[in-house]
Swiss-Prot record:
Protein name (database record): LexA repressor
EC number: 3.4.21.88
Domain of life: Bacteria
InterPro entries: LexA, LexA-like, LexA/Signal_pep-like_sf, LexA_DNA-bd_dom, LexA_repressor, Peptidase_S24_LexA, Peptidase_S24_S26A/B/C, WH-like_DNA-bd_sf
Residues of the active site: 121 (for autocatalytic cleavage activity), 158 (for autocatalytic cleavage activity)
Catalytic activity from the UniProt record: Hydrolysis of Ala-|-Gly bond in repressor LexA
Species for this entry: Hahella chejuensis (strain KCTC 2396)
UniProt record similarity statement: Belongs to the peptidase S24 family.
Length: 200
């Protein structure tokens, strides 16, 4: 059993709550503000102590590079995201319908969540209405890959094609038109890479 100081327990609980509420970990500055530390450096020291004790894992060089151990996150399984509420992060608790008991490592790269597919725009690659698309959270995307993209409050599954300051989100169904996004005029967020499909 991991033994933590009272302050370390507070930091760990804040990390868990932040991930549950938003889908991603807090920054050092957010931890400092919430717990009344004088600086982000104080939060960093507590995070290093938690990592040394095995309570968290840290990813070097990332402002939100805090992970809960796989044993803790895999107990629930992979979250299934249904209708994405406008203005909420994709893994906000409001969007999670249930959990699937498959381990994230079932997919390569590992799946961070399932997105319940709506519509038939990707049917020609076997992604059908109601399927669960396994998604690996990353913004490192290459042309030709299938991605989960957010345009404003809309979330869509399409094939990614970057052309200078423009992105084409391509369907795999001739009945649907490509979505063209001018990056200088419209925000586009990549919510992850499609890494597999299951049908239940």
């Amino acid at each position: 059993m991991i033994k933590l100081t009272k302050r370390q327990e507070q930091v760990l609980q804040l990390i868990r709550e932040h991930i549950e509420e938003t889908g991603y970990p807090p920054t050092r500055a957010e931890i400092s503000n919430r717990l009344g530390f004088r600086s982000a450096n104080a939060a960093e020291e507590h995070l290093k102590a938690l990592a040394k004790k095995g309570a968290i894992e840290m990813v070097p060089g990332a402002s939100r590079g805090i992970r809960l151990p796989a044993s803790e996150t895999q107990n629930q399984g992979i979250p299934i995201v249904g209708q994405v509420a406008a203005g909420y992060p994709i893994l906000a608790q409001e969007n999670i319908e249930e959990y699937c008991e498959l381990p994230p490592s079932f997919f390569t790269p590992s799946a961070d969540y399932f997105l319940r597919v709506k519509g038939m725009s990707m049917k020609d690659v076997g992604i059908l209405d109601g399927d669960l698309l396994a998604v690996h959270r990353t913004t490192d995307i290459h042309n030709g890959q299938i991605v989960v993209a957010r345009i404003g409050d809309e979330v869509t599954v399409k094939r990614f094609q970057r052309q200078k300051n423009k992105v084409l989100l391509l369907p795999e169904n001739e009945e649907f038109e490509p979505i063209e996004v001018n990056l200088s005029q419209q925000p586009l967020d990549i919510e992850g890479l499609g890494v597999g499909v299951i049908r239940r």
